[in-house]
């Protein structure tokens, strides 16, 4: 599993010109599911993200987590995180999970991170054409990948 985690002052998802979901201070998580991901990958990522110490403390050091600041999460599925553009100019997506599997795993990930984070969790709509807006804070952007399997 691969995610792009962005610290935001606000973020939202619109679909067809209509606001679908939004958060204030917190994290926007773009989540990609690979064809090899398992429940272990989802659990690892669900524990990692809410505990990342990427928010500044009173001394200006990145020392506080989403849980510490009482922030929110906006989680958006994004299969293009597994794009491979190493050959040619048109990316391939063979590492991405097929849509049927990705939908199931994405839904499980959202439920797991809701449980782990203990904060408001909003989402986009799996497979929809979404417009994602954000005000990146910092900017702080972290790319996470679940540990490789032996």
Swiss-Prot record:
HAMAP family per record: Deacylase_Dtd (MF_00518)
Coiled coil spans: none
GO process terms (BP): D-amino acid catabolic process
Enzyme Commission numbers on file: 3.1.1.96
Gene: dtd
Species per Swiss-Prot/TrEMBL record: Chlorobaculum tepidum (strain ATCC 49652 / DSM 12025 / NBRC 103806 / TLS) (Chlorobium tepidum)
Name of the protein in its database record: D-aminoacyl-tRNA deacylase
Lineage: Bacteria, Pseudomonadati, Chlorobiota, Chlorobiia, Chlorobiales
Cytoplasm found in the keyword field: yes
Positions of short motif Gly-cisPro motif, important for rejection of L-amino acids: 138-139
SUPFAM superfamilies per the UniProt record, alphabetical: DTD-like
Positions of transmembrane segments: none
Keywords, alphabetical: Cytoplasm, Hydrolase, RNA-binding, tRNA-binding
GO cellular-component term (any): cytoplasm
InterPro entries given in the database record: Daa-tRNA_deacyls_DTD (IPR003732), DTD-like_sf (IPR023509)
Quaternary structure annotation from Swiss-Prot or TrEMBL: Homodimer.
Cell location: Cytoplasm
């Amino acid at each position: 599993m691969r995610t792009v985690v962005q610290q935001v002052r606000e973020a939202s998802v619109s679909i067809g010109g209509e606001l679908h979901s939004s958060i204030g201070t917190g994290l926007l998580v773009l989540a990609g599911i690979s064809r090899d991901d398992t429940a272990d990958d989802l659990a690892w990522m669900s524990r990692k993200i809410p505990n990342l110490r990427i928010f500044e403390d009173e001394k200006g050091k990145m020392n506080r987590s989403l849980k510490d600041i009482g922030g929110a999460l906006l989680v958006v599925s994004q299969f293009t995180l597994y794009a491979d553009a190493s050959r040619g100019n048109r990316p391939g997506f063979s590492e991405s999970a097929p849509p049927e599997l990705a939908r199931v795993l994405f839904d499980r990930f959202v439920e797991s991170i809701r449980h782990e984070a203990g904060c408001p969790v909003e989402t986009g709509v799996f497979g929809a054409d979404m417009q994602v807006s954000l005000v990146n804070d910092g900017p702080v952007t972290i790319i996470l990948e679940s540990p490789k399997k032996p």
